[in-house]
Amino acid sequence: MEQSHQNLQSQFFIEHILQILPHRYPMLLIDRVVELEANRKIVAYKNITFNEDVFNGHFPNKPIFPGVLIVEGMAQTGGFLAFTSLWGFDPEIAKTKIVYFMTIDKVKFRIPVTPGDRLEYHLEVLKHKGMIWQVGGTAQVDGKVVAEAELKAMIAERE
C-alpha cells in the first residue's frame, strides 16, 4: 500500500543506509543522507578517497572519479528517497524491494571529481506515479556543480 511518510527523520547514517539499499562495497556510493523531505527532495554525500579501487585504473597518474559512478550515486540517492517516501525507514520492507534504474537523461559532466572531494548529491522528485519515480538534480563539490542528470527508476519486488 502506497503512503507518504512526511514525518520521516531527515538524516541517515551509513548503518541506516545499509538497511535500506542492497548495494555493498565497492558499489555503495552514499556515506550519509543529510537532508530528506519525503516525496520532495534529498541531499546525500560520498567522501571520495584515494583508497577507492577505481583509482587503480582511472587514472593511475591523475585519479578522476568516473562520471558513471557519479550518476550511480545519484541513482542510489534517488532510490533511497523513493523507498523512504513510500515506506519510511523500514528495513523489513527493504528486504523485499529493489529499485531498478530505467532511464538516464540530460546528463552533463562539468568538473572532474578527485580524491579528497566530498561529493554531494542534490535531488528532487520531478514526478512519481505508483512505483515509478523520476528525479533530477546535481552532484556538487564545494557548492560547485560537477554533474547533473534526470533519472527514472522503478521499485519492484525482490525475488
Swiss-Prot record:
Active site: H58
Designated name of the protein: 3-hydroxyacyl-[acyl-carrier-protein] dehydratase FabZ
NCBIfam families recorded: fabZ, PRK00006.1
Keywords: Cytoplasm, Lipid A biosynthesis, Lipid biosynthesis, Lipid metabolism, Lyase
Entry EC number(s): 4.2.1.59
Protein species of origin: Helicobacter pylori (strain G27)
Pfam families: FabA
Any GO BP: lipid A biosynthetic process
Molecular function terms, GO-annotated: (3R)-hydroxyacyl-[acyl-carrier-protein] dehydratase activity
Enzyme kind, highest EC tier: lyase
Function: Involved in unsaturated fatty acids biosynthesis. Catalyzes the dehydration of short chain beta-hydroxyacyl-ACPs and long chain saturated and unsaturated beta-hydroxyacyl-ACPs.
Location, primary (coarse class): cytoplasm
Family statement: Belongs to the thioester dehydratase family. FabZ subfamily.
CC terms in the record's Gene Ontology section: cytoplasm; membrane
